[in-house]
Amino acid sequence: MFKESLEKYGSLNALASRKNGKWEKITFSEYYCLSRKAAKSFLKLGLERFHSVAILGFNSPEWFISAVGAVFAGGIVTGIYTTNSPEACHYIAYDSKTNIMVVENQKLLDKIMQIWNRLPHLKAVVLYRDSILERHPNLYTMEEFLKLGDDICDATLDDIINSQKPNQCCVLIYTSGTTGKPKGAMLSHDNITWTSAHCSRAGDMQPAEVQQESIVSYLPLSHIAAQIYDLWTGIKWGEQVYFAEPDALKGSLINTLKEVQPTSHMGVPRVWEKIMEKLKDASAQSGFVKKKMLSWAMSVSLERNLNCSSSSDLKQFWTRLADYLVLAKIRSALGFSSCQKHFCGAAPLNTETLYFFLGLNITLYEAYGMSETTGPHCLSGPYNYRQHSCGKPVPGCRVKLVNEDTEGNGEICFWGRTVFMGYLNMEDKTKEAFDEDGWLHSGDLGKLDKDGFLYVTGRIKDLIITAGGENVPPIPIEDAVKKELPIVSNAMVIGDKKKFLSMLLTLKCVLDPDTSDPTDILTEQARDFCQKMGSKATTVSEIVATKDQAIYQAIQEGINKVNTNATNRVHCIQKWIVLPRDFSISGGELGPTMKLKRLAVLKKYKNEVDSFYEE
């Protein structure tokens, strides 16, 4: 795949990273040469066939070069989340027989130094951003490392590259392991090359000979969504990848987007929600006229996007005017002036976020898949779109539903070239994942419309089965509460094996710019809500400590409204509590892509949950 791209795109810029305030760029030819140098150095350090190179660090050219070099050398790429504890790093490195670790900085190196003596296969560690403070045997800087393989000839490396087969493993993606040990999903060369070629085209990503796409890389590369979108698809179609700053998710991402003006952008739902909240905060602080203009422009755009087939000439004129006067300026301020495709994946997108961006004339194309399907198995795009749907299966892939209920909801099952090889060292788990006909079971619930568009409706494990045997999908209830109450950040329904439903709530608060941890200070939008309700509170603790009457009454009224629209009484929230701190990655309630970890929340707030059901 890389050789084909090299012939077509060799002179084009491939990777761009900020050094001393300036963008440093390398071409595809330079990228390929550096990857070969890395491969030779991995061989020199003793990388064994089908053993892994584990990479622990934020997205960077060094991450990409190490990953490609590991594959060239016949090894397996294994990404490790920078938020992992030393023990979690040990589990992955031990399980994948890591021979070499590539580590970003001293802080992450310290984690590895704690576990190195318990990793029998680990031969060397490469540090790529910081200089080495204390010398150790087999510890190298990236500059030293890239020179190690200079005496290995091209023919030796070419023999290894040419001996590799499409059905051999080249990438390991470790699932989060919310219900047990993390599972290493083995992805083959064929999985990676097929997905890079066909999923991206289904989303209308262009080859560089038509238009060179530019993207910003910022989501963790140890997650398949970012790795396939940023790294492998980038090689396939000659994209220019700009690397965001490590604090991208703490607020600097928009600065990078404004500078780069990408042609395509992917975010997980929480990223799109954060952008939405930031804009709502900015709107809350603006003057009366600006507020009214934005509200008018967004309502005109939303109506046009929801009823695009039946707009009169006059409505089309108002839409164009709204876009010219207001919306285009907002998209420019977000860094989306040139962005033609906005993707969302890794978790379901709620209606409020979808409609908010349609109001800005930004369509969010949803992707759906899992680590075990090399990322997107179904994808929306400009020519393949329905609201609330994650599109259709990509070429070479199929979807079916099993055990459908009366409303057409069934478990989503996958078949095709994206489907993984199995779990490393877990034959029993691999057998459990597939049925006797070779279909991979997702554990997700969905329905298909008459045209084959897939709609994900929930997760079987998340489905609440009450003490009375009633099935309750929690996400629609949670989304309804968040829509009704703009002060609420996270809402989680409780009720499995219980007599009634209850709910844990957190409030929207400002994040610490250095750590991304939630602070006690309410966001502008939340303070705005408090003022409207007659409360002077500016912090979460003020509201929780005093059970602020105005806010608690407003929350109860909001929940009453949601209950009024419930399918039946079983779907009604009977008790709730406001937690003193919002959910976060560091708090353990959210995963690396900001997905809610329901079991972890239940465990952490066991006392609060138990209090709902005490007789």
For the regions a protein language model found, what residue spans apply to each?
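Conserved AMP-binding/adenylate-forming core of the ANL superfamily
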Residues: S11-V68, S85-H90, T141-G149, H189
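Conserved AMP-binding A3 loop
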Residues: K25-S29, C170-A197
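Conserved AMP-binding/adenylation subdomain of ANL enzymes
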Residues: T193-S214, L221-K329, S338
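Conserved ATP-binding/catalytic segment of the ANL
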Residues: K400-V402, T406-T466
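Conserved C-terminal "lid"/linker of ANL adenylate-forming enzymes
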Residues: N490-M492, Q556-E615
